Amino acid sequence: MAEMEHAALDEPVRRYLTHATGGRTDLGRRVRLQLHGRVKVGAWLRFDSVWEGDGRSFSWRARAGPGPLRLLDVHDQFAERRGSMHVAIRRLTLVDAHDEDTGRSAAGRAALEAIWAPGALLPDRGVDWRAASDSEIVATWAVPPERPEVHLGIGPDGDVRFARAMRWRGRREGYVAFGADVYEERSFDALTVPTRISAGWGHGTAEWSPFFEANVHGLEVLPVQNKPNC
């Protein structure tokens, strides 16, 4: 059944899924990544982190700070309609956000970060696909309370060039384009995923200002029973 659904997809969509999953339809949905990079919070801070996600939930735990120092503990997460962001220095909490706006924004982030878990994007897993052009494909699926429409720019081989979606930013701003440019990819067994990205609000517009740069240096497909370490 999964193979039949795959065959019925537009060619650019098949090209991406075949490239990302090696043509397999039995892959696990959830992955764990080892990430390092830098994030702009006023100044640029370097981080080391672990991310888990499946396109419908995520957990990101990071240690961040200037230079070699990693003074900040960061935990962003989303699952089952609820999102939160917690930042602390040792036991001193600096940020503790878990309101409705945080949850809606985190749902959009969970969908965009599915480029790291392509096993979660197969059509038999509730994802509706269409091709906008030979080099742009669109995936839509439910990430309650949102239903994001994720646009992927792809190359001739199906490699991801960018990911973009309208993501909730807050009651004042509403939905704003958020996305990432992809500079490198790598294969980890059957999966081929972006491994060097820059991301930010206003993607695809003159207002784009990346504030997050990340490099993936490890990937593990997790058993079905594993959930985010919330």
Regions found by a protein language model. Give the residues of each.
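Amphipathic alpha-helical packing elements
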Residues: M1-R24, V182-I197
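N-terminal mature ectodomain segment of secretory-pathway/periplasmic proteins
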Residues: R14-T93
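Short, hydrophobic/aromatic-rich segments at coil-to-beta transitions
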Residues: L27-Q34, D54-R61, A132-T140, R161-F162, ...
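Short, solvent-exposed secondary-structure boundary motifs
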Residues: G37-L45, S59-L69, A111-R125, A139-P145, ...
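Short, exposed beta-strand/loop patches in secreted or surface proteins that constitute
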Residues: S49-G53, D76, G126-A132, L152
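Short, solvent-exposed aromatic-acidic interface loops
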Residues: A64-L69, A88-L94, A165-G170, A199-G204
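Flexible, processing/modification-adjacent segments and terminal tails
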Residues: H86-V143, E173
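Gly/Pro-enriched, hydrophobic low-complexity segments
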Residues: A139-Q225
